[in-house]
């Protein structure tokens, strides 16, 4: 049995939905109860999602500040993102976050600033004919945006957008953030910078090789580890390079797979369904409580986000449920099956939650306050 009450803040009306087996009941403002009978679990999910989305489009919002771990704290309609990348910018030290979407036929790109309960603090028009692929929140109160392969800096105070790192579009960018560190690619060099202390941590000149794969133009990928001791990058077909950010030492891992991620303690690096010790690059057995399919290709789904010992893992398809694991004890804490994901979603941890930006045009927050 699942029941949720949505509130429309503009009209103060309530809308309630109840799912009992294969029966859906809805009720607007204490009026007549409508009953929908379904003949399968799939139909229940589909019709319930559709009913909730219909009300959310009218301004109804679901909020539950007392949600248990893995339960929804908020569902809100923001509007479909025309570019399909569903960018989010979060950080593990704060609960507020930023979501960007392209409105209409690239008429505008809108940046939303949400608080941890899902209230909109601010919306900013970034302008027409923009396409932000990804964005990160830096400790100096700026966002770095990858706008169609051009890195730009957005000030949260002045709302000014300025060019950052690469001045011309070379179809090659890297952008990642972990703690106070941010990683980016200038078109010639990978840079890791600490915005909290305003110091450069590491810099390396690399040339990204052209790709033979029709899905992307260049091998150009870089990421930081959860504890900020390592970086990983890929600029050629068959190998990843792991960098120790303190010593500058490098380990080369021969692997042409996809979907890399680090363990919460930075000791293991996984890519293409294989596992390696980050210090030596030696192969190792799977240290995680969840299995990972070997030989992961570009089009497969294996998305992993980390906060402390927590790992949010989505595998198989972009619409698959997200598993929330506690790696300190190997426990599966929750399985998040968001009703507003059609084919894919982007998700990221905040200080106490997991935020989803979905292709149905919704923003959901799930409680991860341990």
What are the functions of these language-model segments?
Residues 40-57:
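A short, charged, amphipathic alpha-helix used as a generic interaction element across diverse proteins
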Residues 97-98, 143, 182, 231, ...:
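Hydrophobic beta-strand positions that form the internal "hydrophobic ladder"
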Residues 103-108, 146, 185, 234-238, ...:
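Short, solvent-exposed loop/turn segments at conserved positions within beta-propeller repeat blades
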Residues 342-370:
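Blade-level signature of beta-propeller repeat domains, shared across WD40, Kelch, NHL, RCC1
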Residues 10-35:
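Short aromatic-glycine-(Arg/Gly/Cys) micro-motifs in beta-strand/loop hairpins
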Residues 71-80, 109-126, 149-166, 189-212, ...:
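Surface-exposed loop/turn elements that mediate protein-protein interactions on large endomembrane-trafficking
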Residues 83-94, 127-140, 165-180, 206-227, ...:
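Repeated scaffold domains used in trafficking and secretory/extracellular systems
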Residues 64-103, 107-108:
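Intrinsically disordered, low-complexity acidic/Ser/Thr/Pro-rich linker and tail segments
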């Amino acid at each position: 049995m699942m029941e949720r009450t949505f509130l429309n803040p503009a009209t103060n009306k309530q809308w309630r939905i109840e799912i009992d087996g294969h029966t859906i009941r809805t009720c607007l403002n204490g009026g007549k109860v409508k009953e929908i009978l379904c003949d399968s679990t799939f139909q229940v999910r589909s019709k319930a999602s559709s009913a909730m989305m219909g009300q959310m489009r009218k301004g109804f919002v679901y909020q539950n500040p007392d949600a248990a771990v893995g339960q929804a704290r908020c569902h809100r309609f923001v509007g479909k993102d025309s570019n399909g990348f569903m960018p989010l910018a979060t950080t593990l030290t704060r609960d507020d976050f930023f979501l960007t979407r392209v409105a209409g036929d690239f008429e505008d790109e809108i940046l939303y600033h949400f608080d941890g309960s899902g209230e909109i603090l601010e919306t900013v028009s970034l302008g027409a004919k923009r396409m932000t692929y990804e964005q990160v929140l830096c400790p100096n109160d700026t966002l770095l945006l990858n706008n169609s392969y051009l890195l730009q800096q957005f000030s949260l105070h002045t709302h000014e957008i300025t060019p950052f790192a690469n001045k011309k579009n070379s179809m090659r960018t890297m952008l990642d953030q972990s703690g106070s560190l941010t990683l980016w690619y200038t078109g010639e060099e990978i840079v890791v910078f600490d915005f909290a202390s305003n110091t450069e941590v590491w810099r390396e000149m690399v040339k990204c090789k052209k790709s033979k794969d029709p899905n992307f133009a260049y091998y150009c990928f870089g990421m930081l580890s959860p504890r900020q001791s390592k970086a990983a990058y890929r600029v050629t077909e068959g190998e990843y390079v792991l960098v120790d950010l303190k010593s500058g030492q490098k380990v080369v891992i021969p692997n042409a797979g996809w979907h890399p991620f680090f363990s919460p303690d930075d000791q293991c690096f996984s890519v293409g369904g294989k596992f390696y010790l980050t210090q030596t690059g030696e192969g190792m057995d799977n240290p995680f409580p969840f299995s990972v399919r070997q030989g992961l290709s570009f089009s497969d789904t294996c998305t992993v986000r980390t906060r402390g010992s927590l790992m949010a893992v989505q595998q198989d398809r972009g619409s698959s449920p997200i598993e929330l694991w506690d790696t300190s004890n190997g426990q599966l804490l929750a399985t998040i099956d968001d009703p507003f994901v059609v084919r894919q979603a982007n998700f990221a941890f905040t200080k106490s939650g997991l935020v989803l930006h979905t292709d149905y045009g919704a923003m959901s927050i799930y409680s991860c306050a341990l």
